[in-house]
A protein has these predicted regions:
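Composition-driven recognition of glycine/serine/threonine/acidic- and proline-rich low-complexity segments
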Residues: 1-226
Length: 226
């Protein structure tokens, strides 16, 4: 959460809050699906308690990137999102697991095995690293780095396959696997998955520690000389 206005109240609850009269078993099941994806069992619910109209609450991204709104009211079958892509949603949105039926996608795809399915009639907000690209497939096929897939419509068939021959896999520098998206529907792709961001920053982190140590060593050396 970035900020919220005075009339906004918040409460942490178990489950996704998709049903106002959801019983304990339903809440446990909903929370369990989030646990499998590595997310928290609880979600924070924000409510406008004011009587003078609309109030605002703003959400910040977990790392540099782009936040996109998607209207589930125009998507009767819902939206499939990678497990780290969901950021926030209107009350009434159901968050469930979407297992890929193809064994290869689950065994080798990493991001491809456990996906989240969002259904409802309100807006959801999806986060992507770097720049986001929306592609409209019309009975077409698209190959993408597995980590770059953010979301896609259920009409899209998702699978994971080896990226070319052995030489390409070892020396290509583009990863061992590619995701194949085939069918008709929209696909959202991110330019900078968080894993790539971490890999890009890792060398600088080491240099920063080394330079910091050198600077501290110089300071202590000067103090001792005195």
């Amino acid at each position: 959460m970035g900020y919220m206005e005075e009339a906004i109240a918040f409460e942490t609850r178990m489950g996704d809050g998709s049903s106002a009269d959801q019983n304990l078993l339903g809440k446990l099941f909903s929370a369990g699906t989030r646990l499998i994806t590595g997310e928290s069992l609880f979600l924070t619910h924000f409510t406008n308690r004011g009587s003078s109209g609309k109030s605002r609450v703003a959400f910040s991204a977990p790392y540099p990137g782009t936040i996109i709104p998607v209207d589930l009211g125009t998507m009767p079958q819902g939206l499939i999102v990678q497990k780290d892509g969901f950021l926030a949603a209107a009350r009434g949105t159901q968050i469930s697991l979407h297992f890929n039926q193809k064994f290869g996608a689950g065994l080798f795809g990493g991001e491809g095995f456990i996906l989240q399915k969002l259904t409802g009639d309100g807006k959801v907000f999806v986060h992507a690293g770097g720049t986001i690209i929306e592609k409209q497939l019309r009975n077409e096929m698209l190959r993408v780095d597995t980590g770059c897939v953010v979301a896609f419509e259920p009409g899209i068939d998702f699978s994971v396959a080896r990226a070319g021959g052995l030489k390409s896999m070892i020396f290509g520098g583009e990863g061992l696997l590619l995701a194949t998206l085939r069918g008709t529907g929209r696909v959202w792709i991110q330019s900078m998955p968080v894993k790539k961001l971490i890999q890009a920053l890792a060398p600088w982190g080491g240099n920063a520690r080394k330079e910091s140590g050198t600077a501290l060593g110089g300071i202590f050396g000067s103090l001792l000389d005195e």
